[in-house]
Structure formats: structure tokens, C-alpha cells
Amino acid sequence: MEDDSLYLRGEWQFNHFSKLTSSRPDAAFAEIQRTSLPEKSPLSCETRVDLCDDLAPVARQLAPREKLPLSSRRPAAVGAGLQNMGNTCYVNASLQCLTYTPPLANYMLSREHSQTCHRHKGCMLCTMQAHITRALHNPGHVIQPSQALAAGFHRGKQEDAHEFLMFTVDAMKKACLPGHKQVDHHSKDTTLIHQIFGGYWRSQIKCLHCHGISDTFDPYLDIALDIQAAQSVQQALEQLVKPEELNGENAYHCGVCLQRAPASKTLTLHTSAKVLILVLKRFSDVTGNKIAKNVQYPECLDMQPYMSQQNTGPLVYVLYAVLVHAGWSCHNGHYFSYVKAQEGQWYKMDDAEVTASSITSVLSQQAYVLFYIQKSEWERHSESVSRGREPRALGSED
């Protein structure tokens, strides 16, 4: 394991680890040890997103934010239905959710990537750009998704929609890296995809003997929620950030006092994603059987209670897509999705069938994956649509 010594604001030492995973909060990205918490000024919802810039120096900014348009370039009408090519409902449901992700769709329709990409063939960003453009510009039609979208994944049978979704997101992230494969891990997290879907966990361990504190940061692209004991998404999030006691055989080896001592471990979201992907863990890892229970989820979700920084005001997200599984096992059943189109109308996207729906129907589903976008970003998007304004940069000021 290779360690690099870096500094946060000139005072906190990092120990960097070479292996990263995007969705597991227990995989370390960077660790800080100190004897007490420093004073920090309150942060706004807008500035909190940029905290990841302080985790480590960025050697190279792979996707400048001024090149990520947030305002809409999309047609007003809902787009095309997708043809099922044989057990590909999981592909179609996932693609529809990504197609109606505002910052991703706006970037794809800007053709920013294809104008500079030298790969084209085998590039997931180019493939997704072609798909999203076709889907959104062919309302009332049914189109056939390119086989390249599921190349290397689809094996002619029913697959897990969430696994395909993250396979696609990861492939798009890798497509941002040609020519930059030797950059450091933190710079890789400045890609277009991480700017849209990414954030950072903070795992904080406090030694109860010397009160020393160790912070570990890890990037994420989605958040998995255990729903076994939860009746709502909020309850599942509360369980996720609930402090854990480390004692007895599980006592903590403190790097400050160098003793094995009882400690408290707390996981929180250090930086918030522009677009939040919440996956409800409905399937058993062993049997694949489904947890077929109703888990309530809101149209508007305040993520502030689960953030590292408290007392900074609400951090509200709005629901814009829901991926649903109908059936009793991950090995069979049917996937479809609900998406919120540009004008605010909800639609059920069930392979080739596209039908208008209501928020009441959307909120009554046994959801598998939920897609939320920061309310401030959605409002900027909606405002630009109503005023017919030109696309603005992600994170730019009015």
C-alpha cells in the first residue's frame, strides 16, 4: 500500500490508499487524525458541494464546471418508448431514468463530448449521447436501444437493473479518462459523472480515551439503503448515520494515543451530490429473494440531517425518477420506471409504452432505485425552461 502525505488547509495529514470503490462507505479514500475538531463556519447548500476540493489537492480538473450546462436543451414533450429486445426491460428502465436526469441530458444534447472525443467506437459517453438524443427527439415513437449500451453486460437473461445502471455510470466515468489514466484518484473524481452523481462520505471515529478524532473520506456515486427494519427512506438514512459503538473485541486502535480503546464511529455525508441515486436493498445477496414491502419515499427529501455539517439550513432534493421491479426475485419479474419530464408531468415508461401518470401513483410504488436532484438545481433548470434562457454552467451564480 502506497501512502502519500498531504495536507488539508495546511494542518490535517492525509493517508491516501490506492484502492477506491464508489458506492461503499467503508472503503477508505483519505484519512485524517487529529486531537480535536477545528472551528468551522456554517456552509450554504451551494458551497457544501465544493467541499471535496478541500480533501486533497487536485492535480488536474478533468471536467471544468463551466462546460457542464445545467439549463435545458431538451424538447418539451416526453421522449420515445424503448423496444424490449428480449429480457432487456432492466436496460430500458435504467436508460429512461438516466435520459431524464437534467444535467446529464443537457450535457449530452450539447454534444460537448463527441466534439472532442477521439474514441467514438466503444465510448460509453458517445453511445449514451446518441441514445439520449434519439430518445428525446422522437416523442410518440418507439426506438431500439443500441446493443453497444449493454455490451459486456447483457447475457440474454434477466439481469439486475441497479447493477446495469451503475455499470453504465461507471463506464461513462471511465470514458472521461482517456489520456488521463495516470492522474491521481482525487483528480479522477472531478470528471463530468462525479460532478453530477458524486459526493463524499465521512467516517469519523472518536476515541473515548483521549478524545482523538480520525476522519476517513470515501467517494460515492450511489447510496445503498438497508430497508429490513425501515418503513421509510428517512428511517433507512437515520439508521445509516446512527453512531456505532466500538468496544470489547471490536475496540478501536487509536492512532493518537496508540492504545486499544472504546470509540464511537459515525458515518455521514460530507459532500452532497447534485443528483442523488438511492438504491433500496430489496434483494438478498444469498438467495436473490425480494423484500416485497412498502417503503415510503417523499417527493421532496431533506438530506441536511445526514450531513457532516449541521445547522446550515435545509438541503432539499426533489424526486424526478423512480425505477420499479415487479416480481419476487432478482432473477425474474419485470422492470419499468417513472420519470418527470421537462414540463413537470410524470410518465410511466414501460418498455415501448409511454403513459401519463400522477405523483400519487409514483409515490405508491415498491421502488427499487430513487433518483433525486437538488431542489436549487431543479428550480434553475425549470426557470431557464420557462424563460427560454441559454444553458448556464453547473454551479454558476445568477
UniProtKB/Swiss-Prot annotation:
It comes from the Eukaryota. Its EC number is 3.4.19.12. It is found in: Nucleus; Cytoplasm. GO terms for cellular component: cytoplasm; cytosol; nucleus. It catalyses: Thiol-dependent hydrolysis of ester, thioester, amide, peptide and isopeptide bonds formed by the C-terminal Gly of ubiquitin (a 76-residue protein attached to proteins as an intracellular targeting signal). It is an enzyme of class 3 (hydrolase). Changing C89S: Abolishes enzymatic activity. Keywords: Cytoplasm, Hydrolase, Nucleus, Protease, Thiol protease, Ubl conjugation pathway. InterPro entries: Papain-like_cys_pep_sf (IPR038765), Peptidase_C19 (IPR050164), Peptidase_C19_UCH (IPR001394), USP_CS (IPR018200), USP_dom (IPR028889). The active site is at C89, H334. Residues 80-375 form the USP domain. GO terms for biological process: protein deubiquitination involved in ubiquitin-dependent protein catabolic process; regulation of apoptotic process; regulation of protein stability. Its main location: nucleus. GO terms for molecular function: cysteine-type deubiquitinase activity. Belongs to the peptidase C19 family. USP17 subfamily. Deubiquitinating enzyme that removes conjugated ubiquitin from specific proteins to regulate different cellular processes that may include cell proliferation, progression through the cell cycle, cell migration, and the cellular response to viral infection. Seems to be non-functional in the regulation of apoptosis. This is Ubiquitin carboxyl-terminal hydrolase 17-like protein 6. It comes from Homo sapiens (Human).
